[in-house]
Amino acid sequence: MRKPKITVIGGGTGSPVILKSLREKDVEIAAIVTVADDGGSSGELRKNMQQLTPPGDLRNVLVAMSDMPKFYEKVFQYRFSEDAGAFAGHPLGNLIIAGLSEMQGSTYNAMQLLSKFFHTTGKIYPSSDHPLTLHAVFQDGTEVAGESHIVDHRGIIDNVYVTNALNDDTPLASRRVVQTILESDMIVLGPGSLFTSILPNIVIKEIGRALLETKAEIAYVCNIMTQRGETEHFTDSDHVEVLHRHLGRPFIDTVLVNIEKVPQEYMNSNRFDEYLVQVEHDFVGLCKQVSRVISSNFLRLENGGAFHDGDLIVDELMRIIQVKK
């Protein structure tokens, strides 16, 4: 019997949570990862290697999908100290991806090589072969370019789009990305930052078109917390409305939302300064936009913060896959 094909689209720290749990299931996995990050280590590397697609999100996905020994993972994720000169703040894995990207001619080729080297379960694709610049248009008409600048701007985002960071060419999807979406049985969006992790992938026209054309079940894992500079005062229904608006029509079939209350002591704005309050649940609003709403306890409290429990999310995804067979 053919294994179900599940593709996860996103970036940041959210997608790896789902991918890590999917590895334990009898499915074929693919990850499509944003290349619009311009902050931190990825941003510094982009300045020095203009052809490089930012490696940070790809690095985290690679670790999540790999069966590398724990020590290898610690080496790959090791971040140089602040007194390490030009290397300060860079994870070793980012430098390895950057070096292999240059050696292999592209980040796409580098990820295929690293996937073999670290025995990943599934395929990893950058959403585009070229670094992208994310642009946000705010409701007051202001436009801000660059992911790191967008989150610092005070205002309500109306829409986002991406441009090729190297030239005026239209951003194109990376090799095999469109085919992977069209051949999938399920597409999972999120969890992750709505405007800076998920949308930078799907506003690439080829990817957006593929999502509208695919026969796959499309599931969106809504964030647990609102995010400063992105989704302040958002309900879960608002998140879905934004996604649908960017592609011009509804395309999400299922939404998974956490309804377990986050204890006040886990809303640590000092440690997790981008998070504000728990996303408000709007069941009626969701039902108007999608055919299936799964409201449950998907909460994992860890290290002083509120996160998704990947195993609980994936269990629900597998139930949907079984029903669709």
UniProtKB/Swiss-Prot annotation:
Keywords linked to the UniProt accession:
Cytoplasm
Q: A single Pfam family, by name?
A: CofD
* GO annotation, biological process: regulation of cell shape
GO MF annotations, alphabetized: LPPG:FO 2-phospho-L-lactate transferase activity
One GO cellular component from the entry?
Answer: cytoplasm
Q: What is its main location?
A: cytoplasm
Domain of life per record: Bacteria
Q: Where is the signal peptide?
A: none
Q: Which NCBIfam families match?
A: CofD_related
This molecule's function is given as:
Required for morphogenesis under gluconeogenic growth conditions.
The Swiss-Prot or TrEMBL record describes its family as follows: Belongs to the gluconeogenesis factor family.
Name under which the protein is recorded: Putative gluconeogenesis factor
Q: Which organism is it from?
A: Streptococcus pneumoniae serotype 4 (strain ATCC BAA-334 / TIGR4)
